[in-house]
């Protein structure tokens, strides 16, 4: 099967997640192409793919504009073929924020008009050494509020790699049996 993984990333974790999923799919015998939607490549034709994985991270309660533009431009094809949406956020890392992570997915599907076959809330990462003062304050006083054990100047990954791999396999199972 030929799959396109289209992604948008701000700090690089969604790129890492997309690459990891691509590697997994190749190991399973699939053809995979990665598309960074910020690069606006003209040589990728969505009609050429059998299924899609769309991945984007959440910043300031919204996914990147370029992924929404990609979905809008590809909507007819996306609706006609199997699709998985991966919404990457820190909200997905914390049980008490699950409703927020789910709301990000709902907002995305409402805005774009695309309802994928499966959606995943994927926990992201914190790279506080790259943040400006205001981002640091949001991280400390909102996102990691009451989570002193998680505060660190070192990068922290919250992505559940094994869980992600299992979810991708679940998405593929009905497609592989066709």
Regions found by a protein language model. Name each.
Residues 28, 51, 60-178:
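FMN-binding flavodoxin-like domain, especially the glycine-rich phosphate-binding loop
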Residues 2-27:
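N-terminal beta1-alpha1 ligand-phosphate binding loop
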């Amino acid at each position: 099967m030929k799959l396109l993984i289209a992604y948008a990333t701000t700090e690089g974790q969604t790129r890492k997640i997309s690459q990891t999923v691509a590697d997994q799919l190749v190991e399973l015998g699939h053809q995979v192409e990665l598309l960074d939607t910020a690069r606006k490549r003209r040589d990728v034709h969505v009609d050429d793919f059998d299924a899609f994985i769309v991945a984007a991270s959440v910043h300031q309660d919204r996914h990147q504009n370029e992924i929404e533009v990609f979905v809008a431009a590809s909507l007819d094809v996306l609706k006609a073929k199997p699709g998985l949406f991966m919404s990457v956020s820190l909200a997905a890392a914390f049980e008490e924020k699950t409703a927020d992570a789910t709301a990000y997915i709902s907002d995305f599907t409402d805005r774009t008009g695309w309802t994928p076959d499966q959606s995943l809330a994927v926990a992201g990462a914190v790279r506080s050494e790259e943040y400006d003062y205001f981002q640091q304050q949001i991280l400390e006083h909102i996102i990691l509020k009451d989570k002193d054990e998680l505060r660190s100047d070192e990068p922290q990954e919250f992505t559940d790699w094994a869980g992600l791999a299992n979810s991708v396999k679940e998405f593929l199972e009905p497609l592989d049996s066709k």
